[in-house]
């Protein structure tokens, strides 16, 4: 999205200036301006997937910064997308197959790129409760059908208007609360039974999370609410550093 993802990345950079210094120094932001399934259609060919940077350069020919970008100079590629599985012409099963393909292909930021999903949408970063995280009954799961007509955005706006206990991801301490809530939620979703959260962080890979999400999507028509950005931090900084930051 043109605004939300860029704003959230900027908030992350402000909250973690030292930890994300390398990322901040030469970051190039590119907006795809459509959903993940449209990207799939542009990338997919008979031999697999095309290079995402070259596809985006072709799409944004008028962008001089992007036009002058040498692919060999790009050391890391991170992709942030909403699940956006509601209101599609294709079936849920076909959409899940495409997402699975994409996650298996975009699984390394220094090679093809690393893909991160927000479930169901980027605004999910704004629903964490100060005490109950993402496990309150009103936000633990969200119906796919209720995402229609900006339904999830309206839900988030109403929640932020009516609730006095939302933890806003606008500073370092709050980001760490939001991150921990997302990791605890993933632990619940993935049935990781260890009593020690930090011992299972390494298992919270995007493709593994999606395997559990698609069971909910196909069988119950819901997703477990999760933000992409805590898992980006986990990937970028590593489980050990994240654990020390959350529980110093």
Model-based region annotation:
Residues 1-5:
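Short acidic, Gly/Ser-rich segments with clustered Asp/Glu that frequently serve as metal-coordination loops
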Residues 50:
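Conserved phosphate-coordination/catalytic loops
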Residues 6-29, 34-47, 56-248:
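C-terminal accessory helical subdomains adjacent to catalytic cores in phosphodiester-
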């Amino acid at each position: 999205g043109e605004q939300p993802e860029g704003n959230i990345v900027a908030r992350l950079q402000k909250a973690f200036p030292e930890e994300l210094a390398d990322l901040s120094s030469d970051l190039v932001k590119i907006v795809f301006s459509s959903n993940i399934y449209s990207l799939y259609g542009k990338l997919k060919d008979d031999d697999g997937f095309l290079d995402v940077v070259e596809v985006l350069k072709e799409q944004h020919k008028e962008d001089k910064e992007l036009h002058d970008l040498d692919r060999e100079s790009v050391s890391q590629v991170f992709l942030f997308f909403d699940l956006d599985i509601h209101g599609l012409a294709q079936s849920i099963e076909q959409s899940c197959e495409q997402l699975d393909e994409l996650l298996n292909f975009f699984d390394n930021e220094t090679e093809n790129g690393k893909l991160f999903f927000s479930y169901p949408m980027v605004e999910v970063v704004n629903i964490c409760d100060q005490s109950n995280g993402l496990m309150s009954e009103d936000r633990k799961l969200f119906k796919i059908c209720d995402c229609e007509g900006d339904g999830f955005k309206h839900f988030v706006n109403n929640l932020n208007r009516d609730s006095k206990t939302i933890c806003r991801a606008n500073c370092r301490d709050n980001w760490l609360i939001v991150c921990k809530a997302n990791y605890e939620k993933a632990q619940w979703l993935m049935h990781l039974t260890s009593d020690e959260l930090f011992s299972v962080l390494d298992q919270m890979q995007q493709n593994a999370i999606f395997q559990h999400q698609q069971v909910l999507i196909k069988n119950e028509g819901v997703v477990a609410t999760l933000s992409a950005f805590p898992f980006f931090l986990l990937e970028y900084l590593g489980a050990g550093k994240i654990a020390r930051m959350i529980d110093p």
